[in-house]
Amino acid sequence: MIDLAPLVRRLAGTPLAEWANGLQAQLDTKMSKGHGDLQRWQSALDALPALQPEKVDLTDSFTLETECDGETRTVLRKALLGLSPWRKGPFNVFGVHIDTEWRSDWKWSRVSPHLDLKGKRVLDVGCGNGYYQWRMLGAGADSVIGVDPNWLFFCQFQAMQRYLPDLPAWHLPFALEDLPANLEGFDTVFSMGVLYHRKSPIDHLLALKDCLVKGGELVMETLVIPGDVHQVLVPEDRYAQMRNVWFLPSVPALELWMRRAGFTDVRCVDVSHTTVEEQRSTEWMRFQSLGDYLDPNDHSKTVEGLPAPMRAVIVGRKP
């Protein structure tokens, strides 16, 4: 059982205290329904060797270090491979380098210089395996709660939390819709790589705003296209082989959406083309990746002939 008592204590006396008090029951109900692969992933977690990090770096990377012999490292590597595929990372765990599909550290290096997370209560929506949560703590956040309904990501987070049990990061296997309306308790809310999967992007922005305290900041990272305020791409069917992609706005259009949703001080802090160096297949993620989704003769287009992935980071404030 995952014990959320430390989270309840952490949020006592905050606007999130009432919500926190009901989380254990909500989590237990969700876990009782389970997932077909959950037992296999739990076996991988149970196989993790008991190690105590002597050095932890979450500021410049995710790196745990301690004295570890080759045999123990082999056991560790096998257990972590049992939680494949690993999408977000990389993680350096006692000499085992988890070379994930995404170089998420590159994205974090583009996002983090524009933020001040010191002392902030943070919510990461669609947090994946929690890689960014750990980096947010490294940037000084007071506490970080991630929500993502994917059970494998939940287990990957648990693997890292085994070695960092006292740090104020929690992963809840919930969707944003599972959170109560008008939480209004987080200083900073992240939504990275989620908006284009939403059929109603404005509703998503409004739901994120509901999670923020007054004066709180939204960090929105999503796929965009070139163009003016009137340009929005709605794929006919798939985009980069993904079926569940709905709206890819231009940066000016996304800024307008955020203003219409009630955010102020809206500004774009980064626009980057995704490269096959940043997203690729590895030993830890053996399935197809970005290189398979681009036109082999023209990497400026997807296999469907649409503009290749370009991602923007927009920040805005709740008045």
UniProtKB/Swiss-Prot annotation:
GO terms for molecular function: methyltransferase activity; transferase activity, transferring alkyl or aryl (other than methyl) groups. Pfam families: Methyltransf_9. It catalyses: carboxy-S-adenosyl-L-methionine + 5-hydroxyuridine(34) in tRNA = 5-carboxymethoxyuridine(34) in tRNA + S-adenosyl-L-homocysteine + H(+). One of its GO terms (biological process) is tRNA wobble uridine modification. Carboxy-S-adenosyl-L-methionine binds at K88, W102, K107, G126, L176, E177, M192, Y196, R311. Catalyzes carboxymethyl transfer from carboxy-S-adenosyl-L-methionine (Cx-SAM) to 5-hydroxyuridine (ho5U) to form 5-carboxymethoxyuridine (cmo5U) at position 34 in tRNAs. This is tRNA U34 carboxymethyltransferase. It comes from Pseudomonas syringae pv. tomato (strain ATCC BAA-871 / DC3000). The lineage of its organism: Bacteria, Pseudomonadati, Pseudomonadota, Gammaproteobacteria, Pseudomonadales. The gene is cmoB.
